[in-house]
Design a protein with these regions (language model features):
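Conserved, structured core segments of small domains
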Residues: 1-119
Length: 119
């Protein structure tokens, strides 16, 4: 790095990408709607409790099997903890979704939340 530039400080987050499973096609519409409602209640509760920073659907993902259909942003400091939380999601437990968890970094101060999680 040249002396002309300040070093960049990075903030670390965990990103959970939710994928619809191949098994999802085995579920009838009523079951999918029930599981989705349970999933939505679970993720809303995690955001409201501060365990998860944000969650929501992903639009315009390629319409292929196991496409990404949602994402969650965490700042737990542990991929294992995020995997534990994500795998407890009713949609994951019941086989409608699977989740990929990874670390994501961005320059510090770029992301702010209007309702910060409780400390």
């Amino acid at each position: 790095m040249s002396a002309d530039h300040e070093p960049i400080t990075l903030e670390t987050y965990e990103l959970a990408l939710l994928r619809r499973t191949r098994r999802a096609r085995e579920f009838d519409q009523e079951t999918i709607e029930r599981i989705f409602g349970e999933h939505l209640a679970y993720t809303t509760g995690m955001v409201n409790s501060g365990q998860q920073l944000a969650a929501g659907p992903v639009r315009d993902s390629p319409a292929e099997e196991e496409h990404i259909c949602g994402m969650g942003l965490f700042q737990q400091g542990s991929l294992d903890k995020v995997r534990e939380l994500a795998n407890a999601d009713p949609g994951v437990r019941q086989g409608l979704y699977r989740v990929d968890v990874m670390t994501w970094q961005t320059p510090a101060g770029r992301i702010t939340f209007t309702n910060p999680p409780p400390v």
